Amino acid sequence: MTGAGGAVDIGIATYNIHKGFPLTPLVATRPSLRGLREHLHALNPDLVFLQEVVGAHDGHARRHRDWPRQSQYEYLADTLWSSHAYGRNAVYDAGHHGNAILSRFPILRWENEDISAHRFESRGLLHCEIMVPGLSANLHAVCVHLALTARGRSRQLERLRQRIERHVPVDAPLIVAGDFNDWTWRSRAPHEFAVPLNLHEVFEITTGAAARSFPAALPLLRLDRIYVRGFSVLETRVHHGRRKMRLSDHAALTARLRAQ
């Protein structure tokens, strides 16, 4: 938390957890929640941006003896992240899932905004205002999971831009992270969204390109992003490998930031 010379350092992670099931050649039959929790605890970030988090699922609770009694985000938070927020996006007969933010610091307020591009994909953005000791202004954190279609993503990025312009002061520190589903390398939509807001993608800063994060075993597609404002980037990493495939279809991304 405290860096060199008293600077404020923050560790963050973004992770699409695939509803708590691994990516396998066939249908996944065993949840990977225990392994996911161990993985996140080992990464030990201050803030975690999660996508495809199950808030409740009656069918899984009946079928799997080790299915947690609480929500997935509460189970993953355990004792490490005392503050958390959950945005319910997709609702079905058995339960619901969405995005979540886990935080070591107090979440002062939060809101989940429906940004679904059409009725076949339920998507949302989860916006939290967080009090981080040492920062002169509250941190704004936004977790997103965008559409599979380019047109849908473009509309959602515009909604995201509008929300940030309305609700986030221009001098406030800001992190936007999640699954942008932007698998086409020709796409300019994320860049066009970020530039007017003075947002910078952390892997583009450290490596020159967004991270390859999918599939987890041998990432090829650059689906996930971490955009920041008001921070310098100290370190970035993609946590991939065959063992990670047993946890989710995406690899987790982490970054170490220093407040400017």
Pin down the residues of each PLM region.
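N-terminal, active-site-proximal structural segment of metallo-dependent hydrolase catalytic domains
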Residues: 1-79, 84-86, 91-96, 259-260
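Beta-strand-turn-beta hairpins that frame and shape the catalytic cleft
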Residues: 3-12, 97, 103-109, 121-143, ...
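Active-site beta-strand/loop signature of hydrolases that rely on acidic residues for catalysis
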Residues: 12-17, 36-64, 102, 128, ...
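Active-site environment of divalent metal-dependent phosphoester hydrolases
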Residues: 19-22, 55-58, 92-95, 149-151, ...
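Surface-exposed cleft-lining segments at the edges of enzyme active sites
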Residues: 20-27, 57-59, 112-116, 143-151
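Residue-level detector of structured alpha->beta connecting loops
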Residues: 44, 81, 104-106, 198
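Short, solvent-exposed loop/turn elements at beta->coil junctions and helix N-caps
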Residues: 87-92, 116-117, 239-243
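Metal-dependent phosphoester-hydrolase catalytic domains
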Residues: 112, 129, 161-174, 182-260
